[in-house]
Protein backbone atom coordinates (compact mmCIF):
# COMPACT_ATOMS: atom_id res chain seq x y z
CA UNK A 1 0.00 0.00 0.00
CA UNK A 2 2.80 2.42 0.92
CA UNK A 3 4.48 1.65 -2.40
CA UNK A 4 1.35 2.57 -4.35
CA UNK A 5 0.94 5.85 -2.50
CA UNK A 6 4.64 6.66 -3.02
CA UNK A 7 4.34 6.07 -6.77
CA UNK A 8 1.29 8.32 -6.96
CA UNK A 9 3.16 11.03 -5.08
CA UNK A 10 6.09 10.80 -7.46
CA UNK A 11 3.84 10.89 -10.50
CA UNK A 12 2.07 14.00 -9.30
CA UNK A 13 5.15 15.84 -8.09
CA UNK A 14 5.82 17.73 -11.32
CA UNK A 15 2.42 19.16 -12.17
CA UNK A 16 2.80 21.38 -15.23
CA UNK A 17 0.43 22.92 -17.74
CA UNK A 18 1.42 24.08 -21.18
CA UNK A 19 -2.17 24.25 -22.39
CA UNK A 20 -3.68 27.01 -24.44
CA UNK A 21 -6.43 28.51 -22.32
CA UNK A 22 -9.53 26.30 -22.62
CA UNK A 23 -13.20 27.10 -22.36
CA UNK A 24 -14.22 26.25 -18.80
CA UNK A 25 -17.44 26.04 -16.87
CA UNK A 26 -19.58 24.34 -14.26
CA UNK A 27 -22.54 22.24 -15.37
CA UNK A 28 -25.53 21.70 -13.05
CA UNK A 29 -25.92 17.91 -13.27
CA UNK A 30 -27.65 15.60 -10.79
CA UNK A 31 -27.03 17.86 -7.81
CA UNK A 32 -23.43 18.61 -8.78
CA UNK A 33 -21.73 21.69 -10.13
CA UNK A 34 -19.49 19.68 -12.43
CA UNK A 35 -16.31 21.38 -13.60
CA UNK A 36 -15.33 20.89 -17.23
CA UNK A 37 -12.85 22.20 -19.78
CA UNK A 38 -13.14 22.21 -23.57
CA UNK A 39 -9.99 22.15 -25.69
CA UNK A 40 -9.69 22.14 -29.47
CA UNK A 41 -12.31 21.45 -32.11
CA UNK A 42 -13.59 18.51 -34.11
CA UNK A 43 -15.39 15.35 -33.08
CA UNK A 44 -16.03 15.41 -29.31
CA UNK A 45 -14.22 13.10 -26.92
CA UNK A 46 -14.80 13.07 -23.15
CA UNK A 47 -11.90 12.35 -20.77
CA UNK A 48 -12.69 10.71 -17.43
CA UNK A 49 -9.89 10.63 -14.85
CA UNK A 50 -9.03 8.04 -12.24
CA UNK A 51 -9.71 8.02 -8.50
CA UNK A 52 -8.07 10.86 -6.53
CA UNK A 53 -7.01 12.47 -9.82
CA UNK A 54 -7.89 15.74 -11.57
CA UNK A 55 -7.72 17.00 -15.14
CA UNK A 56 -4.18 18.21 -14.53
CA UNK A 57 -2.88 15.20 -12.66
CA UNK A 58 -4.35 12.65 -15.06
CA UNK A 59 -4.18 14.24 -18.49
CA UNK A 60 -1.88 17.24 -18.89
CA UNK A 61 1.53 15.59 -18.45
CA UNK A 62 1.89 16.21 -14.72
CA UNK A 63 4.94 14.01 -14.43
CA UNK A 64 7.33 16.11 -16.49
CA UNK A 65 10.41 14.41 -17.92
CA UNK A 66 9.00 14.55 -21.44
CA UNK A 67 5.83 12.55 -20.77
CA UNK A 68 2.97 13.23 -23.12
CA UNK A 69 0.30 15.86 -22.54
CA UNK A 70 -2.79 13.85 -23.46
CA UNK A 71 -5.07 16.86 -23.87
CA UNK A 72 -2.59 18.74 -26.06
CA UNK A 73 -2.18 15.73 -28.35
CA UNK A 74 -5.84 14.74 -28.57
CA UNK A 75 -7.06 18.31 -29.06
CA UNK A 76 -4.98 18.69 -32.22
CA UNK A 77 -7.78 16.92 -34.10
CA UNK A 78 -10.68 16.66 -31.62
CA UNK A 79 -12.88 18.65 -29.29
CA UNK A 80 -11.65 17.40 -25.92
CA UNK A 81 -14.07 17.69 -23.01
CA UNK A 82 -12.18 17.04 -19.80
CA UNK A 83 -14.20 16.81 -16.60
CA UNK A 84 -13.61 16.56 -12.88
CA UNK A 85 -15.98 13.98 -11.47
CA UNK A 86 -17.85 13.99 -8.17
CA UNK A 87 -15.64 15.08 -5.27
CA UNK A 88 -12.56 15.49 -7.45
CA UNK A 89 -10.75 18.72 -8.23
CA UNK A 90 -13.10 21.68 -8.57
CA UNK A 91 -16.27 19.55 -8.39
CA UNK A 92 -17.59 19.38 -4.83
CA UNK A 93 -18.69 16.10 -3.30
CA UNK A 94 -22.34 15.32 -2.57
CA UNK A 95 -24.14 12.73 -0.47
CA UNK A 96 -24.27 9.73 -2.82
CA UNK A 97 -21.96 6.89 -3.82
CA UNK A 98 -19.05 7.77 -6.07
CA UNK A 99 -19.99 4.86 -8.29
CA UNK A 100 -19.39 4.26 -12.01
CA UNK A 101 -23.17 4.25 -12.52
CA UNK A 102 -23.65 7.68 -10.92
CA UNK A 103 -20.61 9.10 -12.68
CA UNK A 104 -21.92 7.83 -16.03
CA UNK A 105 -25.26 9.54 -15.43
CA UNK A 106 -23.34 12.76 -14.76
CA UNK A 107 -21.49 12.45 -18.07
CA UNK A 108 -24.77 11.95 -19.91
CA UNK A 109 -26.26 15.02 -18.24
CA UNK A 110 -23.14 17.04 -19.04
CA UNK A 111 -23.44 16.18 -22.73
CA UNK A 112 -27.06 17.34 -22.60
CA UNK A 113 -25.95 20.58 -20.93
CA UNK A 114 -23.36 21.16 -23.65
CA UNK A 115 -25.87 20.19 -26.37
CA UNK A 116 -23.60 17.42 -27.64
CA UNK A 117 -25.73 14.50 -28.89
CA UNK A 118 -22.97 11.87 -28.63
CA UNK A 119 -19.24 11.57 -28.06
CA UNK A 120 -16.34 9.20 -27.82
CA UNK A 121 -15.27 8.52 -24.23
CA UNK A 122 -11.83 7.76 -22.81
CA UNK A 123 -11.71 6.65 -19.18
CA UNK A 124 -8.80 5.70 -16.96
CA UNK A 125 -9.26 3.46 -13.90
CA UNK A 126 -12.41 4.70 -12.09
CA UNK A 127 -13.07 6.79 -15.19
CA UNK A 128 -12.88 3.58 -17.21
CA UNK A 129 -15.68 2.14 -15.10
CA UNK A 130 -17.73 5.28 -15.70
CA UNK A 131 -17.04 4.97 -19.44
CA UNK A 132 -18.28 1.36 -19.41
CA UNK A 133 -21.43 2.43 -17.62
CA UNK A 134 -21.99 5.21 -20.16
CA UNK A 135 -22.09 2.52 -22.86
CA UNK A 136 -24.47 0.38 -20.77
CA UNK A 137 -26.79 3.07 -19.41
CA UNK A 138 -26.65 5.73 -22.13
CA UNK A 139 -25.86 3.96 -25.40
CA UNK A 140 -27.34 6.73 -27.51
CA UNK A 141 -24.73 9.16 -26.16
CA UNK A 142 -21.70 6.96 -26.88
CA UNK A 143 -19.90 6.37 -30.17
CA UNK A 144 -16.71 4.58 -29.12
CA UNK A 145 -15.18 3.86 -25.72
CA UNK A 146 -11.55 3.58 -24.63
CA UNK A 147 -11.15 1.82 -21.28
CA UNK A 148 -7.73 2.11 -19.68
CA UNK A 149 -7.28 -0.30 -16.79
CA UNK A 150 -10.61 -1.23 -15.27
CA UNK A 151 -12.56 -4.45 -14.61
CA UNK A 152 -16.30 -4.87 -15.06
CA UNK A 153 -16.52 -7.10 -11.95
CA UNK A 154 -14.85 -6.89 -8.57
CA UNK A 155 -13.22 -10.28 -9.06
CA UNK A 156 -11.61 -9.02 -12.25
CA UNK A 157 -8.93 -7.43 -10.07
CA UNK A 158 -6.12 -9.43 -8.50
CA UNK A 159 -6.58 -10.14 -4.80
CA UNK A 160 -3.79 -7.76 -3.78
CA UNK A 161 -5.56 -4.88 -5.50
CA UNK A 162 -8.88 -5.59 -3.80
CA UNK A 163 -7.13 -5.98 -0.44
CA UNK A 164 -5.30 -2.66 -0.78
CA UNK A 165 -8.27 -0.32 -1.22
CA UNK A 166 -9.75 -0.68 2.30
CA UNK A 167 -6.36 0.25 3.76
CA UNK A 168 -6.17 3.66 2.09
CA UNK A 169 -6.34 6.56 4.54
CA UNK A 170 -6.08 10.32 4.27
CA UNK A 171 -3.00 10.07 6.48
CA UNK A 172 -1.25 8.06 3.76
CA UNK A 173 -1.56 11.08 1.45
CA UNK A 174 -0.46 13.63 4.06
CA UNK A 175 1.79 16.24 2.45
CA UNK A 176 1.49 14.59 -0.96
CA UNK A 177 0.65 16.34 -4.25
CA UNK A 178 -2.71 14.55 -4.15
CA UNK A 179 -3.62 16.24 -0.87
CA UNK A 180 -2.04 19.53 -1.95
CA UNK A 181 -3.97 19.67 -5.23
CA UNK A 182 -7.22 18.77 -3.47
CA UNK A 183 -6.76 21.63 -1.03
CA UNK A 184 -5.81 23.99 -3.86
CA UNK A 185 -8.75 23.18 -6.16
CA UNK A 186 -11.61 21.83 -4.07
CA UNK A 187 -14.53 24.06 -3.04
CA UNK A 188 -14.23 22.31 0.35
CA UNK A 189 -10.46 22.26 0.95
CA UNK A 190 -10.78 21.20 4.59
CA UNK A 191 -12.72 18.03 3.68
CA UNK A 192 -9.90 15.93 2.24
CA UNK A 193 -10.21 13.18 4.86
CA UNK A 194 -13.97 13.03 4.33
CA UNK A 195 -13.46 12.74 0.57
CA UNK A 196 -10.92 9.92 0.94
CA UNK A 197 -13.25 8.01 3.24
CA UNK A 198 -16.23 8.56 0.95
CA UNK A 199 -14.37 7.41 -2.15
CA UNK A 200 -12.99 4.40 -0.29
CA UNK A 201 -16.44 3.43 1.01
CA UNK A 202 -17.79 3.53 -2.54
CA UNK A 203 -14.84 1.67 -4.04
CA UNK A 204 -14.77 -1.27 -1.61
CA UNK A 205 -18.34 -2.33 -2.40
CA UNK A 206 -18.47 -5.49 -4.54
CA UNK A 207 -19.78 -4.76 -8.02
CA UNK A 208 -20.71 -6.55 -11.22
CA UNK A 209 -21.77 -4.68 -14.36
CA UNK A 210 -23.22 -7.92 -15.78
CA UNK A 211 -21.68 -9.93 -18.61
CA UNK A 212 -24.94 -9.93 -20.56
CA UNK A 213 -25.33 -6.16 -20.30
CA UNK A 214 -21.68 -5.66 -21.20
CA UNK A 215 -21.94 -7.95 -24.22
CA UNK A 216 -25.08 -6.15 -25.39
CA UNK A 217 -23.39 -2.74 -25.59
CA UNK A 218 -23.28 -1.39 -29.13
CA UNK A 219 -20.27 0.91 -28.87
CA UNK A 220 -16.92 -0.53 -30.00
CA UNK A 221 -14.48 -0.65 -27.08
CA UNK A 222 -10.70 -0.43 -26.93
CA UNK A 223 -9.33 -2.12 -23.80
CA UNK A 224 -5.86 -0.98 -22.75
CA UNK A 225 -3.96 -2.62 -19.89
CA UNK A 226 -0.47 -3.14 -18.56
CA UNK A 227 0.81 -6.67 -18.12
CA UNK A 228 1.28 -5.95 -14.39
CA UNK A 229 -1.87 -3.88 -14.12
CA UNK A 230 -3.84 -5.37 -11.27
CA UNK A 231 -6.58 -6.55 -13.63
CA UNK A 232 -6.40 -10.32 -14.03
CA UNK A 233 -5.24 -11.46 -17.46
CA UNK A 234 -8.19 -13.85 -17.66
CA UNK A 235 -10.56 -10.95 -17.07
CA UNK A 236 -8.94 -8.86 -19.80
CA UNK A 237 -9.55 -11.63 -22.30
CA UNK A 238 -13.08 -12.20 -20.99
CA UNK A 239 -14.00 -8.57 -21.64
CA UNK A 240 -12.54 -8.69 -25.13
CA UNK A 241 -14.40 -11.93 -25.93
CA UNK A 242 -17.67 -10.39 -24.77
CA UNK A 243 -17.10 -7.67 -27.35
CA UNK A 244 -16.44 -10.14 -30.16
CA UNK A 245 -12.72 -10.66 -29.75
CA UNK A 246 -10.70 -13.89 -29.86
CA UNK A 247 -11.14 -14.66 -33.58
CA UNK A 248 -8.84 -15.14 -36.56
CA UNK A 249 -9.16 -11.88 -38.44
CA UNK A 250 -7.41 -13.38 -41.46
CA UNK A 251 -10.13 -15.99 -41.87
CA UNK A 252 -13.21 -13.91 -41.24
CA UNK A 253 -14.60 -10.70 -39.77
CA UNK A 254 -12.90 -9.40 -36.67
CA UNK A 255 -14.38 -7.41 -33.84
CA UNK A 256 -14.52 -3.64 -34.08
CA UNK A 257 -13.35 -3.64 -30.46
CA UNK A 258 -9.65 -3.90 -29.67
CA UNK A 259 -7.30 -5.07 -26.93
CA UNK A 260 -3.81 -3.84 -26.09
CA UNK A 261 -1.62 -5.14 -23.25
CA UNK A 262 1.53 -3.08 -22.79
CA UNK A 263 4.62 -4.92 -21.55
CA UNK A 264 6.27 -3.92 -18.31
CA UNK A 265 3.44 -1.57 -17.35
CA UNK A 266 1.58 -1.23 -14.06
CA UNK A 267 -1.79 0.39 -13.37
CA UNK A 268 -0.17 3.74 -12.55
CA UNK A 269 2.73 3.60 -15.01
CA UNK A 270 0.40 3.19 -18.01
CA UNK A 271 -0.19 6.92 -18.00
CA UNK A 272 3.53 7.43 -18.67
CA UNK A 273 3.04 5.84 -22.07
CA UNK A 274 0.94 8.44 -23.83
CA UNK A 275 3.40 8.54 -26.72
CA UNK A 276 2.56 4.88 -27.36
CA UNK A 277 -1.11 4.80 -26.40
CA UNK A 278 -2.45 8.01 -27.97
CA UNK A 279 -1.64 7.04 -31.60
CA UNK A 280 -3.43 3.72 -31.03
CA UNK A 281 -6.42 5.56 -29.59
CA UNK A 282 -6.55 7.99 -32.52
CA UNK A 283 -6.43 5.12 -34.99
CA UNK A 284 -9.25 3.33 -33.15
CA UNK A 285 -11.46 6.42 -32.92
CA UNK A 286 -10.88 7.31 -36.57
CA UNK A 287 -11.52 3.79 -37.91
CA UNK A 288 -14.62 3.49 -40.07
CA UNK A 289 -17.16 0.90 -39.04
CA UNK A 290 -17.32 -2.18 -41.23
CA UNK A 291 -21.09 -1.77 -41.05
CA UNK A 292 -21.00 1.62 -42.76
List PLM regions with ranges.
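Conserved HGGG/HGGXW glycine-rich cap/lid loop of the alpha/beta-hydrolase fold
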Residues: 32-90
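Conserved acidic catalytic loop of the alpha/beta-hydrolase fold
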Residues: 101-119
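Conserved alpha/beta-hydrolase "nucleophile elbow" surrounding the catalytic nucleophile
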Residues: 119, 123-125
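Flexible "cap/lid" loop of the alpha/beta hydrolase fold
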Residues: 129-137, 143-179
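Active-site nucleophile elbow and catalytic-triad environment of alpha/beta-hydrolase enzymes
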Residues: 197-213
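Short beta-strand/loop motif that positions the catalytic acidic residue
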Residues: 217, 223-225
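Conserved loop-alpha-helix segment in the C-terminal half of the alpha/beta-hydrolase fold
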Residues: 227-265, 273
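Catalytic active-site module of serine/aspartate enzymes centered on a nucleophile-bearing elbow/loop
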Residues: 255-292
